[in-house]
């Protein structure tokens, strides 16, 4: 695959986390820095979709949502609208265990015909760890304008590819949404 841009969706204050999710500390550093570390071997072309200045300490391009308060689809719309590459790695900011190896697998298995490629286990699809084509910008705009913001509904409207992984491989894809989940993660890793 030609050059890729990685966009990390820094969605703002989480009601369950009580703070900016990407800046929550895990093993001594913010989630966002764990994600950057996983992305850098893949591409140095990293941008953040964020409406806050809290990420300004990191030397990457930041972009505010073009259409506010539209959840992950709004962030993906902003990313793809601003992207200069056809294919883009879209990641949420709450996946501190993501690895370069898994991202490389996603890219290696991506079929160029698919406009979205994501991982899935038997029990769960991971739409916010994926490769998204710039070609779907107008379709995203359409669903945003209609306030159809559910990621799974959107996925069903687009030619997409699911890369199956075993439940046992699911752990690095875990997204951390609450203090309890963070505590569980710390316990599981200790």
Regions found by a protein language model. Name each.
Residues 1-148, 156-172, 179-180, 184-189:
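Nucleotide and nucleotide-moiety/phosphate-recognizing core
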């Amino acid at each position: 695959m030609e050059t890729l841009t990685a966009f990390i969706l820094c969605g703002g204050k989480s009601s369950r986390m009580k703070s900016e999710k990407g800046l929550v500390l895990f093993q001594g550093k913010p989630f966002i820095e764990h994600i950057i570390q996983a992305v850098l071997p893949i591409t140095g072309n990293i941008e953040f979709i964020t409406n806050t200045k809290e990420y300004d300490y990191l030397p990457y391009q930041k972009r505010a949502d073009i259409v506010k308060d539209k959840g992950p689809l709004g962030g993906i719309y902003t990313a793809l609208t601003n992207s200069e590459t056809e294919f883009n790695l879209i990641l949420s900011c709450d996946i501190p265990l993501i690895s370069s190896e898994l991202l490389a697998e996603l890219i290696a298995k991506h079929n160029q015909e698919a406009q979205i490629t994501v991982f899935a286990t038997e029990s769960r699809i991971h739409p916010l760890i994926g490769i998204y084509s710039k070609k779907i910008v107008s379709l995203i705009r359409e669903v945003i304008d209609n306030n159809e913001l559910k990621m799974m509904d959107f996925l069903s409207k687009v030619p997409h590819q699911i890369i199956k992984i075993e439940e046992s491989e699911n752990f690095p894809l875990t997204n951390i949404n609450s203090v309890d989940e963070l505590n569980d993660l710390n316990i599981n890793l200790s």
